[in-house]
Amino acid sequence: MRARQSIRGGAGALAARGVGKGDRVLVYLPMIPQAHIAMLACARLGAVHSVVFGGFAPRELASRIDDAAPDVVLTCSGGIEPKRRVEYLPAVAEALETAAHPVRTVLVHHREGFETALADVDGRGGASWEDWGEAVAAAEPADCVPVKATDPLYVLYTSGTTGKPKGVVRDNGGHAVALRWTMEHIYDVGPGQAMCTASDVGWVVGHSYIVYGPLLAGATTVMYEGKPVGTPDAGAFWRLIEDHGVRSFFTAPTALRAIRRADPEGELLQAHDLSSLRHFFAAGERLDPETQRWIEGLLGMPVIDHWWQTETGWAIAANPVGLEQLPVKIGSSSVPSPGVDLVVLDGLGEPVPAGTEGNIALRLPLPPGTLPTLWRDDQRYIDSYLSAFPGHYATGDSGVVDEDGYVFVLGRTDDVINVSGHRLSTGVLEAALASHPAVAECAVIGVADPLKGQRPSGYVVLKSGVPVPEPGSEAEAALLDELRQAVRRDVGPVADFRDVVVVDALPKTRSGKILRKTMRQMADGEEYSVPSTIEDSAVLEALAGVLRPAR
């Protein structure tokens, strides 16, 4: 009831500032309840929300303001990271001054502990800056506005892109139908039960399974502003499960690798009662087999890997545990979801035999809940997704479907490297490196080679407690040789795997995806842009000296 009152009040505050059906509202908030309230307040009015990950740089925020053309921006004083506080108001003010599109109003939720006050930014960017709490208190609560099933609910900009951002459009009707179905049949969560999705509302996972999915199912959703490690330790997820009686938990593989690195023996898990937990899900990037086996061993239950994209809004391939759980195959996202006609094609668009790697595509039409277009750019939608293989949606991922119909996603198509004419998936090479007991996580890229075209180059992060050998020492030479032998054993000499180095950390987006393309561009001496979604640019800077391996 309190949530409903807050949403009605928030919708009333927006309506009082001229926001109505079809108008856009940009939401720039961290993982706090006000983000959830803001999104649902927009939906109540038929307005289109566009959530931007809290902490994005002003330039990137400005580009999204120009594309979405919002009337109102909803933000707060700042966000809290494990080692710092991020001031939001100066970033919003700079973005408004940079953007060509004029924003009428900025509503600000006050949080204690931040330096910038509302008065410090008042009037900047030509906008009216107002206190959110005061605006809600003074507003008349708003009723729901009817919308068509095909009216847009939100626009969400994809991460890791350069140039003009791609605004994925989600419609109302298909989205609601798909999420309601998946909550019951994929995640096995119903009324009164709790689901915890350790993501962010700035990403599609947060939209679908922190905000809308649990609401449509009548379930409890757990919002968590912290991190898998460091807030306060690597037992944070286990504490959430115990404290809130979580039935289904959903996170990204990068979080699991971070926990494994900090607590490789899983000692912190032992202090918590996880008896409520029935299912543990992973998605967002490839779940390497070594990490999957590790977490399964700790939990004593299968880890359900599944695969989807910002564009699809829900799982392309999944294990329907709410219907009947299928046997789990390590490294597989299970089987195509109902309504998804998944095929694997060669470069000419012809289907390949079972067990053969190729381009993963979806035969049209796409199922409910997937993107109908890109915001104000139908032609870019056609060019980006529908042109490579006519009659199909091109996922941009490569993979294999085995004889049992299980899908194995091996990586983005630009993550396939060509060594002397042999196409090798970086995912396969990374799985071999990750099998070494000292490795917490790793990345492999293809670097230019004058003789072979490309050579694989590996970068590994060691587990917590494993000593990092001195450069040039016998210990380092022994470790690197073991890593080379692991690849030779699992992949074969065809990989010609020689270049491998130990690093402190890998560069990632805030959603946990490793920036392999940027690493490859740096290694090859190409021009590159640091993606706006990068979690810590200092990690990339630290790698600059090691990304070009010796020839």
Language model feature labels by segment:
Residues A176-A194, V204-R247, R261-D263, E267:
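Conserved AMP-binding/adenylation subdomain of ANL enzymes
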Residues V106-R111, G123-Y157, K164, G174-L179, ...:
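Conserved pre-ATP/AMP-binding loop-to-beta segment of ANL
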Residues A219, R247-F250, R260-P327, D341, ...:
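Gly/Ser/Thr-rich phosphate-binding loop
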Residues V335-G339, E350-Y385, L424, E527-Y528:
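Conserved ATP/PPi-binding loop(s) of AMP-dependent carboxylate-activating enzymes
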Residues A13-A62, A194-V201:
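Conserved AMP-binding/adenylate-forming
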Residues R44-E134, P253:
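Structural core segment of the AMP-binding/adenylate-forming
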Residues L348-G349, L451, F497, V503-A523:
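Flexible lysine-rich "adenylation lid" loop at the C-terminal edge of ANL adenylation domains
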Residues V27, V52-G78, V92, E242, ...:
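AMP-binding/adenylate-forming catalytic core of the ANL superfamily
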